[in-house]
Swiss-Prot record:
The gene is hifC. The keyword Cell membrane does not apply. Essential for piliation. PANTHER family: OUTER MEMBRANE USHER PROTEIN, SLR0019 PROTEIN. This is Outer membrane usher protein HifC. Disulfide bonds join 813-833. It is found in: Cell outer membrane. One of its GO terms (biological process) is pilus assembly. The keyword Transmembrane applies. It holds the Pfam family PapC_N. Belongs to the fimbrial export usher family.
Amino acid sequence: MKTKNFPLNKIAFACTLLLANPVAWAEDQFDASLWGGGSVLGIDFARFNVKNAVLPGRYEAQIYVNNEEKGESDIIFADNPATGRAELCFTPKLQEMLDLMDEAIVKSPNSEDDTCVFASDAIPKGTFDYQGGDMKLKLEIPQALTIRRPRGYIAPSRWQTGTNAAFANYDINYYRSGNPEVKSESLYVGLRGGVNFGNWALRHNGSFSRFENQSSSGFTDKGKNHYERGDTYLQRDFALLRGNVTVGDFFSTARIGENFGLRGLRIASDDRMLAPSQRGFAPVVRGVANTNAKVSIKQNGYTIYQITVPAGPFVINDLYASGYSGDLTVEIQESDGKVRSFIVPFSNLAPLMRVGHLRYQLAGGRYRIDSRTFDERVLQGVLQYGLTNHLTLNSSLLYTRHYRAGLFGFGLNTPIGAFSADATWSHAEFPLKKVSKNGYSLHGSYSINFNEIGTNLTLAAYRYSSRDFYTLSDTIGLNRTFRQFSGAYLPEIYRPKNQFQVSLSQSLGNWGNLYLSGQTYNYWEKRGTNTQYQVAYSNSFHILNYSVNLSQSIDKETGKRDNSIYLSLSLPLGDNHSADSSYSRSGNDINQRLGVNGSFGERHQWSYGINASRNNQGYRSYDGNLSHNNSIGSYRASYSRDSLKNRSTSLGVSGAVVAHKYGITLSQPVGESFAIIHAKDAAGAKVESGANVSLDYFGNAVVPYTSPYEINYIGINPSDAEANVEFEATERQIIPRANSISLVDFRTGKNTMVLFNLTLPNGEPVPMASTAQDSEGAFVGDVVQGGVLFANKLTQPKGELIVKWGERESEQCRFHYQVDLDNAQIQNHDIQCKTAE
């Protein structure tokens, strides 16, 4: 193999690219004489006489059915002898994504056979349109042949497990303070990490702390180094359960009843596995259309849903959960123009579920408090069910050897507001005291939203617990106390008796916002009632923002009454900078503060704050802080001093270390699910995540948060990568499972200019318009006039390439190559391409 390096004339190079374009537009006839006429071997140029012609091969495309996006997938085109051109293959993966009725498909693909089943034969009633320039594949088919799914539905088979990897989140904070009399130091390290292997995720969290105090007299108090274990569990999800299974140390996650720590097993539903339009509460809308009609659903004057339905009964059950309350107005516009409407009551303020939806949890194991595990074995079951548009039922059972509790309740949606109520019965046993207690607790709440007068929200909640009502934590704690202090009397633990809360927020338009709240509560073991009130008002005057907060708390047992007032002002000082001031008074104490804060940097990666304060007793303090965020974490520092000669300094850093198949990557702290990006040779390219992340020296980066069971778009902005790095694509789709670590590979090339002058064993040049693929089936270039393969998508310095001008073995050849991908000059190689014997 000969190798030559030479500069290529730019005009000739551009002409080569144009001639290599395989697509002919509109109905233009392809003139084969421009390519040498009959001297070209085996190429049927008639394939390019159709619009958007495409060569055989594998392509990436966004899939659409009747203009509804279904997701991203690889698609395959193969030569169809019946039509003389490459046509779309109907693969099992494509069949799954299209989500069509069985009667729409007359010929199904065979997952065990690579034979191409052409989509035009498999779905004769559909019309496919592949738009190569936009990388889109569109199918138009009668709506009756599609399976109606909730909006945003993603088949569980498309959920991605992710890659095997390990990570550790860390949060380190060092604090030092002192004055002439005493000095102290403390160190805190918070950890949360895990390992993913297959469908399982192992997670652990804990913290390490130490401190040291030293007085001016020389006395030193060194605290013990202490590591506190939190949760340690193994978890995976199951589509069949619409939930997950957790084994180990964890906290129960019931939305009703009591939550606590366990060492054991939990099976619980996960609402995130539902389509986005099925999460939260929204009513099912039912109606009847007399003709082919347009149905519009409005809330608070805005159209939130619209669909065309055929004549007859219709059901709409995929409304997105709204963040606002307000009845739904359903308008039916018939084909003759007549419009009729009806109202569906709706409030999102009660614990409501959609009709037919179920939320559950079953947990059992040994009781845990902090990092301690006790002998008491606990079993808990929780069930919530949406019975109708207006009624949701809630229930919970809790069982241990010395404690039982049962809860039953409901959420009710009505035109005059949302109600919820529940009753809990408890039976607590204290064996060492030979005493058992039976009690109950009643809870009720009411909420309503008056949108007509400016989004006025009222919320009231009341709970009453009888004298003999004990929670699980009360019972276990008391029994442990009795065992530790034999013969001790029944200690006081301050169990709630009455609790009442009310709050109201009111938008006043241009006059600002008003918020009122109040609560009162008392205990069986204490006399008197504690009461708290709060009034808050906020508004702006031109660019000045201001707020006032008044509060009062009353303890009738001690007769203590605390009144406080807080006033704050904030004034913008240009982009991302502001000055703020506050005044507060509590009793006889008055404090004033003045500060400046903001952010700066190309991506606002730096932030700062400077404050000065004083009180009415002559005390003054000054403090400042600075923080920085980048791809590998966040860093913070602060300093303060006051008029009493107290000084303090703190330093902090938080981030994550992620180990994966491409190495070890430093990152910002990661969430439950996150993604690893790998793009070879693309160091410096920015990640389009809004998280101030760039690819490191090795072409790796971490997107710290992804949304499970949803389509996530992971993108790269290549502008800061080396100029000769070429991306096959700059955006990918992933659909991660909960707790998954996704690996997103972006194929890149150094855009090395390599020309292979290919000849066949008989001395003829390889046919023009042939395509070349690497051993993995990836496209690397086209053959132009004279058998020249322009290969600008090589990803490996050596390997084997396959050149095709048809699907038969006699219409293919292969050759091995070795090039220098770091060479910026054009490389030219003379090679004989070997055909099958």
